[in-house]
Amino acid sequence: MEQTWRWFGPNDPVSLDDIRQAGATGIVTALHHIPNGHIWNKDEILARKTLIENKGLIWSVVESVPVHEEIKTRTGHYSQWINNYKTSLKNLAECGIDTVCYNFMPVLDWTRTDLEYSLPDGSKALRFDQIAFAAFEIYILKRPNAEADYTVEEQAQAKVYHDNMSAADIKKLTTNIIAGLPGAEEGYTLAEFQAQLDRYKDITRDKLREHLAYFLHQIVPVCEEYGLRLAIHPDDPPRPILGLPRIISTIEDIEWLTTIEPSPANGITMCTGSYGVRSDNDLVEIIKHYGNRIYFTHLRSTQREENSKTFHEATHLAGDVDMYNVVMEILREEYRRKKVGDNRLIPMRPDHGHQIIDDLKKQTNPGYSCIGRLKGLAEIRGLELGLRRAFFENK
């Protein structure tokens, strides 16, 4: 696997020098300062690429070129936004960058209720609490008919949870959910957030699928012409939230995706932390069946709790994700490609990381502290080395 690292640009507290010292060779980044929907021009792309290469690294993957909300709802100026997207893809390809991660999640990127969940060893992790989220939806946001998405028991627990919240607790939970996280590109006030949700009130799962299919049919020919690889990121969490449809959450969704647009340019990001939240997602089977469409991997693990919809982020080799067999299957896919003349490694980044050691004293991007990811990368690197030596070299 190609060892990569997500970098949020010049303002990231983790520097390119730090990343190189961590042992990564590839950078995963985006032009976060460009508003969603606007064209990434070549000057901007080359400036970022040069900055990376001057530190002895390469820009391996774009994460992400954000998809404008009007493309997802297929309203307003969606045609113009798609044309802009095509131009950005073309410009990236002509600058020598050929792998683009993106997502089609309505309104929000990845969502958590707690960005500083304390673990028994004193480290901090990201957490999604189903009951806290229910309290937010029902009693803070007051989304119409939100109760229908929760069991009677969950509703009762949410009421108790909300009744025990202080004003500061409510503000913090609201901020965690709607203010935007690294990669989300946009943040919202409560009123703005509800207005964004309302834009989807008539958009069903099937309708959102139709909109993604239309988008792919428009951009895949550009990818084919310029040798680009698309890698859609799964929903996080991988289920409907806030009354919004989610369409990239399961192996059945991947089957639909690759059927409606069979071009090899239409690929996936194998995010084990997102898919792995669902106990009915067999990660190894996903890799076995769709390995030829995996162009990017995010390796992390989560731990489901007593309420199976509540989870926190585990260390990279622990939790519910069988990282041993996941990495084994990724290596099998790499060797399969090698046999047919494709020697390119699959880009992998250690996704998220606990806030540990000296980073506990620093201001860090939630999930993207340096030392936690350094630890995760080292663990995965060691696992890969052991598997390669034991099962693949000279065989």
Curated annotation (Swiss-Prot):
This is Mannonate dehydratase. Its cofactor is Fe(2+); Mn(2+). It comes from the Bacteria. Catalyzes the dehydration of D-mannonate. The gene is uxuA. It comes from Photorhabdus laumondii subsp. laumondii (strain DSM 15139 / CIP 105565 / TT01) (Photorhabdus luminescens subsp. laumondii). The keyword Lyase applies. One of its GO terms (biological process) is D-glucuronate catabolic process. It catalyses: D-mannonate = 2-dehydro-3-deoxy-D-gluconate + H2O. Its EC number is 4.2.1.8. The lineage of its organism: Bacteria, Pseudomonadati, Pseudomonadota, Gammaproteobacteria, Enterobacterales. NCBIfam families: PRK03906.1, uxuA. GO terms for molecular function: ferrous iron binding; manganese ion binding; mannonate dehydratase activity. Keywords: Iron, Lyase, Manganese.
